[in-house]
Amino acid sequence: MRLARLLLGAALAGPGPGLRAAGFSRSFSSDSGSSPASERGVPGQVDFYARFSPSPLSMKQFLDFGSVNACEKTSFMFLRQELPVRLANIMKEISLLPDNLLRTPSVQLVQSWYIQSLQELLDFKDKSAEDAKAIYERPRRTWLQVSSLCCMACKMIFTDTVIRIRNRHNDVIPTMAQGVIEYKESFGVDPVTSQNVQYFLDRFYMSRISIRMLLNQHSLLFGGKGKGSPSHRKHIGSINPNCNVLEVIKDGYENARRLCDLYYINSPELELEELNAKSPGQPIQVVYVPSHLYHMVFELFKNAMRATMEHHANRGVYPPIQVHVTLGNEDLTVKMSDRGGGVPLRKIDRLFNYMYSTAPRPRVETSRAVPLAGFGYGLPISCLYAQYFQGDLKLYSLEGYGTDAVIYIKALSTDSIERLPVYNKAAWKHYNTNHEADDWCVPSREPKDMTTFRSA
């Protein structure tokens, strides 16, 4: 039975000794043959926790976990073991990157963040929210008073640690991107390395999204700093149980439009249509993380506006961007159509490639600004956000006319399950196996001179 199911079931039932009886205390000892205490140093700790697979949660489980029955103690017990597992799994893959990439200052900085975060989390591995002696002890207090104070202190310390880790990892994406640029500029990129780096970054950034989701949920639910703005009071952590899709789309459009107006002094209009096939006549709502959806549509709007403005620059008339939203029994689909001239078929894959970008190199210290072009990571990261809860993002282009971008999101919260990378033999082989030659004929860039071939 997965660790997540044990703990989430306990969360709904309320706190108690049942977790220990269910085998939670044995989850990192009985199956592995050793305990983390027996491993020495960071490499040993990483090796130990990387032996375990992450426990993916569904959107429904996130909702149940953050409901009125939510228990901070259960969140503490789950995260103190799940977060090291997720960190260690991806840290093993970081160590398999090319040596020259690992030596870049930016990648070394990212590694140091992950090591520090893992060590801070492991400070809690032997502590209990109810273990008074582990956290706090004062003379002249009754055991009940001490236990209550210690339980509160432990949870507060852990929550502060979670918030500190979340803030530390704020710039993981641009910093790792900077490392890839440093490597590319110094050593160039061959096809095999490019393929391995693409494989790694997809998994690394997906892991980062999942870790941040856990950190955000705990800090927003138990951070103790109020409920946020009135518009977010119905949220469960970062999840809106009734996310109004059209409102998020309009928000993304307006913000992208402001940037477009600043840069091009004009912008295309928006034509928005919705079709609720599941509940006709009702607004389209779905259980989702609004910030994830916003990231996707904002990125797509920026791309569509940029293409439209540049393709029609000489005409002075800019066709509108059309967005169609439909909700069916299984999928929520958002299709964004522009008339920005499209992209040749051979270039579509490049748009999702981290190693390929025509944009000028940005500075990391200004990475929090939102330009119309940056590292070239907008589309691949947006695709990962869509895939994180079993959705997807696809591009369909008509060269000379325009592009359709389609976002797929699961309509049911029970189907929206985390997609998590796991370090195993298959992943290891991907980094260490020599890729064989293509088993299909690859056409040359120039046509062959057939006069050089003579019949026998």
Task: Please give the residue ranges for each predicted region.
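Flexible, glycine-/charge-rich segments associated with ATP-binding catalytic modules
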Residues: 2-3, 18-74, 95-101, 126, ...
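Signal-transmission coiled-coils
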Residues: 35, 39-274, 286, 290, ...
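Short helix/loop segment immediately N-terminal to the Walker
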Residues: 187-189, 266-273, 278-280, 310-318, ...
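Conserved ATP-binding N-box helix of the HATPase_c
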Residues: 258, 288-319, 328, 383-388
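Conserved catalytic core of two-component histidine kinases
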Residues: 274, 323-327
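Acidic ATP/Mg2+-coordinating residue in the GHKL
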Residues: 338
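Glycine-rich G1-box
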Residues: 341-342
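Short acidic-aromatic loop segments in the C-terminal HATPase_c
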Residues: 352-356
